[in-house]
Amino acid sequence: HSIDEMERVFNRAKKIPRPVVIHVVTKKGKGYSPAENNPSVFHGVGPFNISDGIVEKFDNLSFTENFSNKIVEMAQADNKIVAVTAAMSKGTGLDAFSRKFKDRFFDVGIAEEHAVTFAGGISAGGLIPVVAIYSTFIQRSVDQIIEDIALQNRHVVIALDRAGAVPSDGETHQGIFDIALFRPVPNLSIISVAGKKDMDLCLEWAVNKAQGPVVIRWPKMACPSELEPFSAPVEPGKGVLLQTTDFAPSISSFGQGEDSWRKKVLLVCTGSVFSETLRAARALVLDGIDADIYSLRFIKPFDEKYFAGIAKLYYGIVFIEDGVKIGGISEWIESFVRSSPETSFLKTAVLAFPDRFVANGNRDQILDEAGLSSEKIVNAAKELMRI
């Protein structure tokens, strides 16, 4: 804005003895030409080069970029796939889709509630809508997801970007409530992906095999290096188990001695914090503690029998969830573990976002403050094992 002009207008308004409406037209990026010319790029500002306005990118393929590539690939093979967003085509990675399939792309503007209901109608007409929205903004659509999607059991895929810790976007944009909000909703499947291959397989399942609505969530970060177990086929309710030998074969003491299970801890994580969990597991193995990882993949449904069969082989479980603890999946699984005869002996600990809003910061700062950094995971596991 022009500050001088606004001051003149406000001074005039003070002198008018009746109600006044001042229409202030915002020029996004005013005074900085790269921002004025690319307002969508500078909607959420991370590190960038001041001289030319070029925004820093992740060194590796990001989750958003992978989604962008995969949804275009799938749409080329199936003309029933359409994409819906709410004024965030670039941020969610749908800009490539919008250029490739102009007649199958719908930007409804800043109206997330309408985006969801609109997608339900599209689904009723026989198409497969993929709705891409940030986790924080999907909170506006809770009623529509319940009434217009889940209650009708519509085959709608909701792609939640910026799930979990969201760096640089402030406390209003954290994606920490979606699991607690949507886990109780009947008919709704929820998936949390851990990397590129995991996302690809889960998107294919959600679009091609799911019979009802599916929420798939991923973080604002680069995709971590893949490990072979994530190539496992998608089975509803089941996650991906990574044993110590999968990620630390040269230093593993897995299986040594008849009583070795008593040294073992299982780290159960949602996909968005797999990287931190993996670093913690490797650190624990270096300290002589066998630590396996169970990436949940499915938040809902959850195969209790399958999980109990895995969990009973361990001494303790640490849950790592990039969502609020109250109402989260970790809290529920911990309750199940304690009440099941097969697993009631297990020691457990839950690491999740506490009951307070999240301050602005980078990803490492946010996770450390919430107790979800790799160092905090290691400490929790050692405390559980009394080491």
What does each of the following model-derived ranges do?
Residues 192-209:
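Conserved glycine-bearing catalytic or ligand-binding loops at nucleotide- and phosphate-handling centers
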Residues 106, 189-191, 292, 349:
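Structural signal for short hydrophobic segments within the conserved structured cores
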Residues 81-84, 104-107, 125-136, 156-159:
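A short, small-residue-rich loop immediately preceding and capping a beta-strand
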Residues 249-261:
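A cross-taxon signal for low-complexity, glycine/charged-rich
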Residues 1-44, 51-99, 113-116, 138, ...:
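Thiamine diphosphate
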Residues 93, 105, 112-132, 141-145, ...:
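Extended, hydrophobic alpha-helical segments in both membrane/secreted and soluble proteins
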